[in-house]
Structures are given as C-alpha cells and as structure tokens.
Amino acid sequence: MRPAHAKFKGAGSPAPFLLAGRPAPSPIPRAAAARPGDARARAAGEIDDPRRGDTGVSLDTLREIGKQITSVPEGFNAHKTIQRFLDNRKKAIETGQGIDWATGEALACCTLLKDGHRVRLSGQDVERGTFSQRHLVLHDEKTGIKYAPIQHLEESKAPFELHNSPLSEIACLGFEYGYASSDDNSLVIWEAQFGDFANSGQVIIDSFLASGESKWGLTSRMTLLLPHGHEGAGPEHSSARIERFLSLAAEGNMRIANPSTAAQYFHLLRRQALIKKPRPLVVFTPKGMLRQPAATSTLEQLTDSHFHFILDDPSATERRDKVERLVLCSGRIYHDIDGSDQRAEAENVAVARIELLYPFARDQISEMIASYKNLKEVVWVQEEPSNMGAWSVMRRRLIEMMPDGVTLDYIGRPERASPSEGYSVAHVQEQQRIVLSALTPNF
C-alpha cells in the first residue's frame, strides 16, 4: 500500500509536494492568506465570533430534564430493550458520568425548549436514529400507542417538532431550508440517514444554503447532521464529503464543525440557536463513536463550559517542551490515534483536534502551534483520501503560520476516485497505517 505523504517547510521555503510519488504545485505564499486579526477577514466573516457565548446549563436543570426524558407514563409498556436504554440514560445523568452523544443532543434540545426556542428535527429515521441511538419516540408494545417524552417537558416554552421524512433529500432539504429562513427563533435540524446521501440534495445546498445570503440576503440557522466516518462500511456509507462543504465556505456564509465529544456537540447545538449572527451549520456526526466511551462527557462539562473551536492535547501539559511533532486532526480519527497502543510511547508527539473547520480558528491555532517551543513538524492527519476531507483547505490555511524551521506534513489515504475501500481487510490495514504513521515522527 503506497503511503500518502506531503511535506512543506515553514518560513516561506516550500519543499516539494509529494503525494504517491507525484509532484504538485508549491504551497501558496504566506501573503495570500489573511493574518491573525486581519480586519478584512473579520469583515467578510472568515473569522467566527471569538465570543463563544454562554451555553452552559445548571446541574439542577439538566438533572430535572434528564428525569423527565427517561420516564414513561404509568401503564406504558415499553419494550425491555428500550426500558434498559432509558435506565442507562437515567443512570448516566444521575451519576454525571458517561453522557453519550444522543443524551447530549437530547439535553441540548430540551434546554432550548425551556428557553423558548422551537426545535424542529426531521430526517429519514430521526425518531429512532439511524444507529438506534436516539429513541425519541417510544412505542407501547401492547397497544402501539406512541409517546415522545421530549414533547411533554414541564415548563417548556416552545414546541419540539419531530418528523421521519420521505426518502427524498432534495424535497426535505428544500422544505426545511424554507422553514428555517422564515423563523429565526427556531433551530431547524435535518439529518441525513448517512452523510453520503446529502448529495441528493446538492442543488439546495449549493443554491440556497451556501449562497442564499449572498444572493438574496436570506439568513437561517438551518443545521445539517451528516453521519461521517471511515469504519469499513464501504464507499456509499463513509463520507459526507467534507471537502465539498469546505469548497462552498466563503465570506462567513456557514459554520462547519466536526465535534469529537458529547459535550462539544451539546454546546455546538445550543450555540447555533443562541448566537446573534444566524448562519447555516453543517455538523459531521459520528456513527461508531456514538457509543464510544472515549467520546462521552461528564454532566459537569455541560454546565460551565462552551464550544471550543480547537482542543489541545490534555496529556501534553506536563511535557510541552518535549513535543517535536504536533498532530492536527478532526473528528473520530482522534480517538483512533489517542486510543492506540503506541500512544503512550510517543512522548514527543501531541495530538490536537480542530473542532470548527470553518470559519477557520486562525488565532487560536496559531497560538497553540507557537506554544510548542521545540516543534519540528506539524502533521495533518485524516482518514479520507488526500483529494477529499479537509486537507486541501487546511494545507492552504496552515502553511502560512508555520514557524521558522517547522514543516507541514500530511498523513492519510492517497488520492482516490472512491471515498473508501469496499473491502474490510483493506480498510483495517489503511486505518492502522495512518494511526501508526501519525505517532511515528520522521526524525
């Protein structure tokens, strides 16, 4: 298997670009990209509002909501599997440990309802969740009666609308965009069954979501949830096409995020509803990570925190001066790297996450890179092929902020026509190669 590798030097001295042995154009000069604090970039919306907003919620409120969304009416006959699901969620909220992705989502939506913000969630399988993670609508196994706990919250000041939609992405996206653009107080969410299927609604994404404000002054808080991740499911169930959304991102027209924990997702949804400047939000959501212990959060993290544009390596605090390679990544690949057997041995490697892909958190990333005084290289790691994912955009953004003597490298799959392998053994081999390469410096 040929490795995909690219290397550039900082300080304006580009080295040859190598990808599967093929030369490519030199990196753009630093002058072509906006500097930190560049007034023009901020005016164009290229730099998101650094005031992250107060998105934390009190423990008492979260626990009270948790009690309500894990309860069923007296005499309701829930299936034993669903009852176990509710009991596990109730225990997580009571103990404050193990808050998973779907629980974070439910708590975010419920707290918005209490604040008076309508929440509307539609998609091809949103009631249950494509991966059986949500279970917002319960069915009495004896009578067939439906019950949605989230629609019966005490002190709710706005309705929660929940709709399993037809298998027509373009029709649903068009309707939901129209709804969102006409009601600024609503958080309108459309979820694809798999992120790959969003391409069936590409006309709405291109003509309205990405450019509606530029053409007609139409703004919205329209939110897309696109399940994404290379987990061996094949080319039609692996990629939400991060590269396509990033290619549409300009002039601050949208927000694009790839959160890696339940708490980050919780704060991201609340921020989207509360932030003063409405923009569409594209979220690349997980599949296997929905139940991954490493991606869970504590209830405390939902109270006194906010959405972080980037997450530095928490394990590097005591060994910052030893770090010579800084790995930058986004989404689920972080957990593959952080959970690998080689992680503990790589003392000179730090692994940081870019949670907000657009607008680019230029100032924060630049400060983080500068804080590693003995850095030799920065590596962008992704599981997507090099002509897909975030690499093309990240390369352009990152090269201009490399300190003197620090190189910018790429590790991931080489250029491909198809998003992923169709053979599980080949997938596992590639994932292992990427993770091992990320933790093995070239010096």
Give the predicted meaning of each segment.
Residues 1-443:
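Flexible, glycine-rich loop/tail regions that form catalytic "lids" or insertion modules at the edges
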